[in-house]
Amino acid sequence: MKYESIRPQVEQIAREAGRIILSFGEFHVEEKEGHANFVTDVDCAVQEYLAKVLSDLLPGSHFIGEEQENEQLTCAPTWVIDPVDGTTNLIHNYRQSAVSIALLEDKHPVLAAVYQPYTDELFFAMKGCGATLNGQKISASSHPFERALTCFGTSPYNAELAERSMRLALAFLQNAADIRRSGSAALDLANVACGRIDVFFEIVLKPWDFAAGALLVTEAGGRFMMPFEDGEIRFDCPRGILAANGKCAEQALALIRSI
């Protein structure tokens, strides 16, 4: 595959970014626009590191990160990253945060790495090559919808969507097996990919939250959809997303669209 040669370096970079996260004993917290929307100097340090090493790894590539939103996605090779997905978890030492790295070409993911530094779990995928966890092949689950464990995401700074998110969560609680909320979409998508959970949805997510996870899910045999719109899956602006195993996907999609 085209980017197979850089896989070892990307994996090493993801792990080093995780080590940076773990190296901070204390850190400074600032609020961004919106209620309870935080950024720390950990986010900034990891993004600065990733911007440099990924650009050096693939000269001429572009870079879009959560803490630097000003670049527009083009067809050129572009790194789309979230330096710390789960910043609020990090602040509270909840230990559910991840480094999310995706390489997009022609505006779609071709390489993905999600690293959970607290458990030393590295999820990796390349288009057409399957998905792995610490080098071992992974696949989405085969649980039917009535046995599905569902994760969902929402955020205090999208308060206008909170009520609908909770209605959807209640519907899944009443129709599937159970629900969870982890606070890290990248990890939730990775957990769909490896079969730990069966469904994940969120009404609005930024591309750096889901670009890597989308490729992990599809390469693991799951389904990745945008349930609130028709047409091509896009990674150039905020979207609502649904990820599920093949057995759950259609029922989950129908339930979301019915609420």
Tell what function each PLM region has:
Residues 1-84, 254-257:
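N-terminal subdomain of lithium-sensitive/metallo-dependent phosphomonoesterases centered on the IMPase/IPPase/PAP
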Residues 73-132:
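DPxDG-like acidic metal-binding loop motif
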